[in-house]
Amino acid sequence: MTQYTPMIQQYLKVKADYQDAFLFFRLGDFYEMFFEDAVKAAHELEITLTSRDGGSSDRIPMCGVPHHAAKNYIEQLVEKGYKVAVCEQVEDPKTAKGVVRREVVQLITPGTMMEGRTIDEKENNFLAALTHFEDGSYALACNDLTTGQNTVTLLTGSVEDILLEVYATGSKEIVVDSSFSKDELNKLTETLKMTISYEDATAIPEGLEHLVKNVSQAKLIKAIGRLFNYVIRTQKRSLDHLQPVEIYYTNQFMKIDVHSKRNLELTETLRTKEKTGSLLWLLDKTKTAMGGRMLKQWMERPLIQKEKVEERLEMVETFVNDYFLREDLKEKLKEVYDLERLAGKVAFGNVNARDLLQLRRSLLQVPAILEAISLLDNAYAARLIQGADPCESLTELLGRSIQENPPLSIKDGDIIKDGYNDKLDQYRYVSKNGKTWIAELEKRERDITGVKSLKIGYNRIFGYYIEVTKANLAALPEGRYERKQTLANAERFITDELKEKETLILEAEEKIVQLEYDLFTALREEVKVFIPKLQHLAKVISELDVLQSFATVSEEEQFVKPVLTTKREIFIKDGRHPVVEKVLNGKLYVPNDCIMPEKMDVFLITGPNMSGKSTYMRQLALVTVMSQIGCFVPATEAVLPVFDQIFTRIGAADDLISGQSTFMVEMLEAKNAIANASERSLILFDEIGRGTSTYDGMALAQAIIEHIHDQIGAKTLFSTHYHELTVLEESLDQLKNVHVSAIEENGKVVFLHKIQDGAADKSYGIHVAQLAELPDSLIARAKEVLAQLEGQEEIIIPKRVEVKVQEQEVIPEPVVVKEEPVEVLEAKVETEEESQLSFFGGEQSSKKQDKLALNQKETAVLAQIKKIDLLDMTPLEAMNELYRLQKKLKKG
């Protein structure tokens, strides 16, 4: 290092402590980066890479950004998952002896960003800390530095279960200790796409003990300690806004795994990963940013305590029934800014005068809000606002201290109102009267000299001056002025009197700016005292905002208040999928009932593709979620139990575990439901078993249905294309067949989207293929094959038998179900095979099958089709292969 210049040596010494971060090294008006940081930053930020002499034989790579634009560049890096260490000059270069002293003042990371475009106003920005214990358990602590919120929970179960809970927090960064295994770290980085940070200290930092008074469990304290130590080490500033730690237990809320949340599109859509089109999008009528964040938190964790849900529902009903109260509340909420994040900025020291003005405007609305709610005859409302302080003294303080239109910077003056500070008023008087004197002096000198163009000006280098054009110099009295500066077309002068006033004016203006800054920082410290009260107010207002949002959307969309029952029964009359109905935008939506008495556990749903089976299933899940977060539901009448968990397998879900086939993911999700569901759970399985052969799929589907029916007893909607399974209604007394109806008109299928009792009579798969505009020749061939397959006389369905756990496997005895044969074309297959395998039977039929005559080329094409593995092909690849084979047949 001795070969480098002192400044580069200083850089390398600081960089050694921040190897995993970009080091923004302050040099005058720029933040500079050197060596590998410079090369990488130039690429990521698309800025010019240069070099400089650093004392060694080779020039050092270098790039930099202006200090006034650094915020934007830092946000870009953090958005990409990087960390940025900000190293400032901490002494005046004019008084420094040798190299200016520099220190890192903040480490900015994805989990500690306080503001900027990466921070969504209606989403939390949680930093997570995960601690692993020898008994296999984990403690998960989370902190949102922007709001001061802290939570902690103890987790048990598989590593995948732990990862799913971590994923549910939405954290972009996770803090672990150095003992975490490489496999664990890979799952966090590759599976959850999180930035990894390390912290081994677990003792609660001095000064933060009061935040964990309600936490006694050693494991939880370790996780919180790790989190707090990391925050203190990286932020290096006041954390007065941190709130007491809230302990939560996952069994206090309805469990919805990540796959199910995605399938149901609770907070984002499957296709675009955006809020628009999700349930959150529909329900979010909140007027405040903090209300929007609370709404999302409620949706992530629906309640399972019936009494708490009913309290929310009653409050929503109050708002629904009182239009004027609700509208008045909404108007006031529009004027309330983000109290939580404003409090965080006050504590952090980066609050400006405009922020404090927003705080005052928000507080002005609070007394009326609290008074209106206090008049309600509602125990929940009374308890909600209990202890809420409107902070009227703070409102008064801000009202008499902050100007109405202050600048963004707190170092340019013009922040503090007249009358707030006597000394400031005196300086302003001197400055104002001094400038008045200057104007009077200018008029007087014009009169004395007779030069009408004479003017008095000011610049920072020369101060105040009298300027006269060269054409008028002869008119000036001899010896009246002292020459100060010569310009091309004018001369500038000074007088003793003007010098004296200049000193007074400039001193006053300089003192004004400094005094205003001092007064503002003192004011900020006074506001800090109110942070706990502001945070309590924020929670009250957020909750009221969410409840009015529920009431607003419930009235607009004609939702109904659900009745919660302790019985295991579902009664939904004219239920609708709330988002689909909204997206249809006034077009006719077909409502459907879902009536499952206490002794009815399984609906086996059949019907054609595109008929609405999946929508019906999602509809029930969304109604359940809406009910248990305290919102009215899309129906004309609804009686619902309180579910403890929702399990879904609907559509193609992403594989968080990574690298698994679609069928494997399907089986893992089925296993998750079977292993964890209770009779208080809701299970939605769509087409289980489709990812394997017909026989395997049908066998698995039947076994899963029987297990849920006999062993779990959970309310279950199970859709299937295996129409043969509908005979299970005869042997499973708590299973009922329902179907989505369709009719044929003029050779075309019309989907009615109506759920009716009984099994579907047809699949209409070929009609769907026609709608997709597959070639006519292919459709015709499919109809021929279908007719042949439907001609099979016998369908083998395994008889249901009792199978005890850990006993020898029992092979079910086949049951023969007779069907009427369908007339087919008489033809002879001219191939080497003498008979065709039965599609439904387990063996070849003894009865000789009718065959369709095929030529040699057609036989070869069929052989190729048999070899195609459709599960390993994309839809586009499948269509291309189909086109190739069709082209080959046409040539023949």
Curated annotation (Swiss-Prot):
PROSITE patterns registered for this protein in UniProt: DNA_MISMATCH_REPAIR_2
Pfam families: MutS_I, MutS_II, MutS_III, MutS_IV, MutS_V
GO cellular component: cytosol
Top-level taxonomic group: Bacteria
Annotated disulfide bonds: none
Keyword annotations from UniProtKB, A to Z: ATP-binding, DNA damage, DNA repair, DNA-binding, Nucleotide-binding
GO biological process terms on file: mismatch repair
InterPro entries: DNA_mismatch_repair_MutS (IPR005748), DNA_mismatch_repair_MutS-lik_N (IPR007695), DNA_mismatch_repair_MutS/MSH (IPR017261), DNA_mismatch_repair_MutS_C (IPR000432), DNA_mismatch_repair_MutS_clamp (IPR007861), DNA_mismatch_repair_MutS_core (IPR007696), DNA_mismatch_repair_MutS_N (IPR016151), DNA_mismatch_repair_MutS_sf (IPR036187)
A molecular-function term among this protein's GO annotations: mismatched DNA binding
Residues the record lists as binding ATP: 607-614
Transmembrane segments: none
Gene3D superfamilies noted in UniProt: 1.10.1420.10, DNA repair protein MutS, domain I (3.40.1170.10), MutS, connector domain (3.30.420.110), P-loop containing nucleotide triphosphate hydrolases (3.40.50.300)
NCBIfam families, per database record: mutS1, PRK05399.1
Function: This protein is involved in the repair of mismatches in DNA. It is possible that it carries out the mismatch recognition step. This protein has a weak ATPase activity.
Record family assignment: Belongs to the DNA mismatch repair MutS family.
Official protein name in the record: DNA mismatch repair protein MutS
Protein's organism: Bacillus cereus (strain G9842)
Upper taxonomic lineage: Bacteria, Bacillati, Bacillota, Bacilli, Bacillales
